[in-house]
Amino acid sequence: MISPALLERVACPVCLESAGCPQCSAPAGHAACRDDYVRRVRCACGGPDKVRLEARAEAALVCPCCGASYALRRHDGYADLGPVRPVGEVTQYADHEFQERLGTTDAEPVLSARVKADMMRRMLAPGAGEVVLDLGCGAGKLALYAGRDGARAAGVDVAPFFLAGAAAAVDLVRGDLRRLPFRKGAFPSAYSLDVLEHLDEPGVLDVLVEARRTVGPGGRLFVYTHAMESSALARFQRAVNRLARRLGQAGLIDHEREALRKSDHLNAIRSHEHFEALCAEAGLEVAERRYYNVVFKAVVEDLGLRLYEQARRRKPRPPEATEGRSANSLRASVKPPGALAMAAARALTWVLKLDVVLFGGVRTGPFFGLLRPRGGVQEGPHA
């Protein structure tokens, strides 16, 4: 949806106000935004605010600085605020056919998705009425769940393939996380799940910088991602994965969806120290961290769930069943799990939470992190 509150928060993704501290202020005009955006937005003060958009018609917003026009797609439930020119590589998640192959439903998150969502809610701890920004919200499924318990969620994603339920209940924006189209301090908190691994190192830094600016000096940012490390416990997961591959070769399970989901991973975060350095360069610090050693997940979800899915897999739909249909309508046609399956998944979710309860202090690659803005931005190689 596009609420009046969202329209108060949005801004041009690429234009900065001229006013700032002595280090980031600049003459008015788009030239200073175009030529000096990166340096100014990474200023230790948090950078200038972004230029507010002006309404020119019911379905359009215009930037008074660069002149770009942005559409309000009210029928589809989102504001189209992506930069006119691409910032970097465009993920395949923005591809219509790729999204159709992934598929999704608006069923509540369960299993590892629920573990991540509940860790976000525990560590971020949004208050009643607080609006939380989902950075890389995908179809908007988690944003729907994050809006429970009195908090509200807004979502931004590079691909506008949103679930109908999310488009009706959540403020949604199509935008690039590397150039967030929001005013400074627009949201008190934000989260990013399974997103940073899809970016190269400059992209990770850009997202952290933009997130810091968007949550403001007193804000909070939760991330789930992974560094290129592993613990001794990861050997068990690798053994399960080897077994799963053999079962896949025998036609007993299907790896396609998981392979698709990870197919454009760049895995730029080399270690936890590397991530901390990127955070420091972006003006953030890691306030809390828990590791995710996926012992129970490997058995229950990576192996058991795939065996179950293969057993109940329906025959493929004929091509004419999807021809000429939008991505949103294709998503709506994906068969949701039944009540019994959901009850079993909820129960198994508690088993998967043991991975955090028992092994959350054992250093490994995947981790949950709570980040907060720090006093100043450290100079780094990307400055």
Task: Mark where each language-model region is.
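Conserved N-terminal segment of class I S-adenosyl-L-methionine
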Residues: 2-179, 183, 191-193, 205-208, ...
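Non-catalytic surface loops within mature trypsin-like serine protease
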Residues: 83, 160, 227, 293, ...
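Short catalytic micro-motifs in class I SAM-dependent methyltransferases
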Residues: 194-198
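S-adenosyl-L-methionine-dependent methyltransferase catalytic module, highlighting the catalytic core
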Residues: 201-210, 214-216, 220-370
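Short, charged, solvent-exposed linker or helix-capping segments at domain edges/interfaces
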Residues: 219, 378-383
